Design a protein with these regions (language model features):
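Rossmann-like NAD(P)(H) cofactor-binding subdomain of soluble oxidoreductases
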Residues: 1-78
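Short, flexible turn/loop "capping" segments at secondary-structure junctions
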Residues: 9, 80-83, 185
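A general structural signal for well-ordered alpha-helical segments in protein cores
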Residues: 12, 24, 50-51, 95-99, ...
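Internal alpha-helical scaffold of NAD(P)-dependent oxidoreductase catalytic cores
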Residues: 34, 53, 57-61, 76-172
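Residue-level detector of family-conserved "landmark" positions at structurally sensitive sites
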Residues: 40, 65, 112, 172, ...
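Glycine-rich beta-alpha junction loops
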Residues: 46-48, 66-71, 94, 115-119, ...
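NAD(P)-dependent Rossmann-like dehydrogenase/reductase catalytic/cofactor-binding core
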Residues: 103, 152-233
Length: 233
């Protein structure tokens, strides 16, 4: 299917919401006739605020989760997975209700007792890389080689916001992110950069502006992210 169906014959038990973050609300609205209070909604869009954005819109139960995957849209309804990278991270609260399903489907997964920390661990990297590749118009490996100090500075800004939000990422999280970046191909793109180049909708608000708003709430300066967002918005 290329859009949400409103003709389901019964209420759905579990819904994996695999849209872009800016499409999630519309997708959820399209499913409204198929949801009940017992339905489990699992959004896996990039970002750390999916649950807080979606829960007020439905009586179904929304849970935070994230996915590690490298893929891109071929056409509506067809997504190509580009590498073997795949891992679904879910909250421990969903283990009993979802593990049998995930094992049967052959999906690599793990359950976490601190899902917010898992979200921010992924977000630290994808936010920094997504915004910097888009700002400079170069791949991830090139960002690391040409703008090493700025990349490290941006990672530190995001790390600081996470701490202010009560998310205690490991002390070496930035070092690990830099190490990952150092191993990436020079021309490796990010989905945010690709979407902005196409002039389509993008996750800029989720990956960049969200951090600026949170920084202001906590009185934190984010000059690098502010500069990038002002150019890209």
């Amino acid at each position: 299917p290329t859009s949400a169906s409103q003709t389901a014959s019964r209420h759905l038990d579990i819904v994996f919401l695999c849209t872009k973050s800016y499409q999630s609300k519309e997708a959820l609205k399209g499913l409204s006739n198929s949801l009940s209070e017992s339905t489990i909604i699992i959004p896996v869009s990039n970002g750390v605020d999916n649950k807080e954005e979606l829960q007020p819109l439905t009586s179904a139960r929304v849970f935070d989760a994230c996915v590690y995957i490298v893929s891109h849209l071929i056409k509506p309804g067809l997504v190509k997975k580009s590498t073997d990278i795949f891992a679904l991270v879910l909250p421990m609260a969903l283990q009993e209700e979802t593990e049998a399903l995930l094992l049967k489907a052959g999906l690599r997964h793990k359950f976490s007792s601190d899902i917010k920390k898992e979200l921010w661990k992924k977000f630290l990297f994808i936010s920094a890389m997504g915004t910097m590749t888009s700002y400079y118009g170069i791949g991830m490996g090139s960002v690391y080689k040409q703008h090493t100090k700025e990349l490290e500075g941006l990672l530190n800004e995001i790390y600081g916001i996470a701490r202010a939000e009560g998310i205690l990422l490991e002390p070496k999280a930035i070092d690990k992110a830099m190490e990952t970046a150092s191993k990436l191909p020079l021309d490796a793109p990010t989905s945010l950069w690709l979407d902005l180049k196409k002039g389509k909708g993008s996750e800029l608000e989720s990956l960049s502006h969200y951090l600026i708003k949170k920084a202001k709430e906590h009185g934190i300066e984010t000059p690098i992210m502010q500069k990038i967002y002002e150019r890209l918005r």
